[in-house]
Amino acid sequence: TLKPPGRVSTGNGADDDEEVEDLSGLPEIPIGGPGVYPIHAASGVGYGLGLAGNAHRHAPDGWLPSVKYFVEELGEDVNARDYNGYAPLHNAAARGDVELINYLVEMGADVTVLTRKGETTADMANGPVQRVTVFPAVVQLLESLGSKINHNCVSC
C-alpha cells in the first residue's frame, strides 16, 4: 500500500458539516449549471467516488472507444472538468485504466490537475474512498508523468 505509517482513516476526509477548501482554482458552478459532460461518463465518472464501486470498472473494450469517439469525432476537451473538478484522467486513474490514461495523456490531458477537494490523478489510483481498489502500478505511472500523490489512501 502507499499509506504512510500512522495515518488515520477518516472516511471521506471531512465531516459532513465541515466546509472543504476548493483547491482546484475552478470557478464556482452556478445553480443549474453543468454537472458532468459526456466525456466524463465515457471515462467512468463516479467510480473514484465509490458511487459505482466495481460495478462498471469492467466494461470490456468499452471505455477507450467511447472516449476516442468523444475526443476525435466530437472534439470534446480531454481536460474538461465536472462539477467536482474531476477530469476524465481522474476517472481513468480511479479504475486503473492504463490504456485510457495513456490515450488521454497522448491527447494532451494534464496529469497535474486537482479536484475541488485537492485530489490528484495519482490520488485517484490510490484508493480515494473505501472499497475502491488501489492500483500501485498506475500510481507509479502517473507520478512518472508528473502527478503528485497526497498519500490519502482510504482503502489501504
Predicted segments with their positions:
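Ankyrin repeat domain, specifically the short helix-to-loop turn at the C-terminus of the second helix
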Residues: 1-5, 65-77, 102-110, 140-148
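Alpha-solenoid repeat scaffolds
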Residues: 7-9, 45-49, 77, 99, ...
